[in-house]
Design a protein with these regions (language model features):
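Conserved phosphate- and dinucleotide-binding cores of soluble alpha/beta proteins
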Residues: 1-144
Length: 144
């Protein structure tokens, strides 16, 4: 260890990702992505580690609007780091995308509970995951 406590540290090669899927608060159509919450959640690192990178966002805005809601430091994803952008409001559900929305704890608990039971998992999949579109998924989530 390079530290005074001589703790034994382990090093390993970085994982190589085929594809990274990230979600940001705002983006422009060129692939510049902005986070408005307190934590970037390593999305920039995922993009740098992957061969192909796709970004969903709460809202696609004109490039000049990206700095209206946050400083230059909130632009952590640049257009050279992504291969595609899609607007997907609620796309980080059931996790959070602050300040747009927080974590859906009730849904996360439902997910965790059903994952333990094959029959419950099948019902969960049918209700939420095997729907035809993102809109249908969001409607199923709101209907609970």
């Amino acid at each position: 260890s390079p530290y005074p406590d001589r703790e034994e540290l382990v090093a390993m090669p970085a994982l190589h990702l085929d594809v990274a899927l990230i979600h940001m608060n705002r983006a422009d159509s060129c692939g510049n992505g902005q986070f408005l919450g307190p934590d970037l959640f390593f999305d920039d690192l995922y993009c740098m580690a992957a061969d192909r990178r796709f970004m969903s966002c709460e809202k696609i805005v004109p490039t000049e609007e990206l700095l209206r809601e946050g400083s230059i430091h909130t632009l952590k994803i640049n257009r050279m780091m992504v291969d595609g952008v899609v607007e997907a409001p609620g796309g980080a559900h059931f996790t959070e995308c602050p300040p747009d929305y927080g974590r859906d704890e009730a849904f996360q608990k439902e997910y965790a509970a059903t994952a333990r039971d094959p029959e419950a998992w099948e019902a969960f999949r049918a209700r939420y995951l095997e729907v035809g579109s993102e809109r249908e998924y969001q409607e199923a989530v709101k209907s609970r």
